[in-house]
Amino acid sequence: MKLFLFLLLTATSGLAGEWTIPLAGNTYRTAPAPGSGINRAGKLVWSNPEEVHSIYVHLDQAATFDVALRGASPTPVRWKLASANQSFEIEAEGADLKDYPVGKIKVAKAGYLKFDLSGLKKTGANFGEISDLILQSGNDDLKLHFVKSNKGNMFYWGRRGPSVHLGYQVPKRKNIEWAYSEITVPKGEDPIGSYFMANGFGQGYFGFQVKSPTERWVLFSVWSPFKTNNPNAIPEKDRVTTLAKGRDVRAQKFGGEGSGGQSFLKYPWQSGKTYRFLTRVQPNDDDTTVYTSWFGDKEANEWQLIASFRRPRTKVHLTGFHSFLENFSVNFGAEKRLGLYGNQWVCDTDGTWHEITRARFTADATARGGHRLDYAGGSKDGVFFMKNGGFFADRVEFDQWFEKPSNPETKPTIDFKNLPKGEPVSK
């Protein structure tokens, strides 16, 4: 009996860990262009032999794996799976899902591991369907991070990637009326889906986005005090009102992640250039607050009004000054983005400017839950920075403070009285 137990333990010791990685939350089409092949059932289905679908998983140390694919194809197909400088071909046939052994791979270091999946041969309309990548390892200390399930719609949020934030330390016991900041996006760090948010506050946000290969927006939004994701459900008394907007700016209601007033300008902002953002917060005696934002190319020394909104049931000065970086396109969650957030200042109601030199780096539930580990932020070369996506290795822990050196010479010089007032919309 003792010999039997010994042999049993010996035979199973190579299977100390097994992980099932669902493709629905961890896979991107990476060639010939970013996209998705995941169907509504959460399975990868594709027919183009030129496509490559990449699966990502994070390891905390070097490891050796036995690899398998869980899939099905009613007609004979041949798949190719490449990872860690090794490549395998897998023959598959069968209408029901089953596990197809791939082979053994050895990974030399910790970090993100990518598996590139493609189709070599098909006899039907497509290369079948694949639901999971299965990894087995004899290392019982090994930890893997990936999107494990769709709980909380995490297949969607996980494929978007982690969002990161910088919360700025502003002077206490001061009524802050103005917030100023600058963003520079380095060349090549602005994939589709990027939102570089510059001036965030307790009731809204202001920044710029990459909407498509040919379209970019400057976006300024203010939430209604009425909590809903359906803007049509907001009572008249709780609606955000557009007071003015700049030339070519579109103002409308929005929903989905809270609801309220939204304005945007289609503007061809460029990576490698520095842009500046200015937001004014004016509380009124009738328990409303007016939020107004301007945008401009720093080098051109220009300002243009984006919009001015009035928010009901609100009487506050600037609160919660922050910036963030997010990706809003699930098909571009494997692309890295980087923003340099610099020269933050606030101006109080007495007209005194205060420089911001401290910021707290935080992250969303996708990062905090360990679903994605490709996030970073901090201070470097005199500015704050944030980075996410792309499955990079140099992660920075969230919930820590960073400082940048003071530079009083960069204090904004703004003629507040002569800022563009735009086109009145309503009273």
What are these regions (language model features)?
Residues 3-12:
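Sec-dependent N-terminal signal peptides
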